[in-house]
Amino acid sequence: MPARLSPYWLWLLLALPAMGMISPFFDENTRALRGVLHGSGEFSARFMIISLMATPLMLSTKGSRFARWLRNNRRYFGVAAFAYAAVHTAAYLIGEASLARILAEATEFDLLTGWLAFALFISLAATSMDFAVRKMGLWWKWLQRWTYGAAVLTLLHWASLHNWNGWVAPAVHFAPLAALTLYRLWWMHLRVRPQATA
């Protein structure tokens, strides 16, 4: 993956899945809007997973060219994850079309985890700009660690839908991230380090 790839081309690639998600918001095709709900949620999870894989990939591949490219561009994937999560949320709100029903369902486990994940997405996206990074200093890194919390909540939200009957798809999606995260923890805390020589 070329390190010089323009961010504008990357943004275009990240936006491509959204092209077919626009028209259902302007017609009364409930089935199409339901498709947007599912598709946007899945792409949000995928882009978040990709952004979180950057650091463990750097370790496991000893800083391969692709891993370095992903690390340098992971913020774009994170912002794209938020954007698709926003589309996902909008599709849900419009599809329900009832504030009373939305509030009644908000405390159910599958939806509560989704709302909490989206709240974290908002705070992470709001502080993703260079100005926020400079202003927050070390606090920015602390806040970014909550991305892992958003990932866990997203996994629980997706897996618990329909009474946990659809847990296989989220498990498959998150398995590579889980494996790489375990490797990262092993590398940081459990690996045998060479003894220092006097």
Predicted features and spans:
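Membrane-embedded alpha-helical bundles that constitute the cytochrome b-like, heme-associated redox core
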Residues: M1-A198
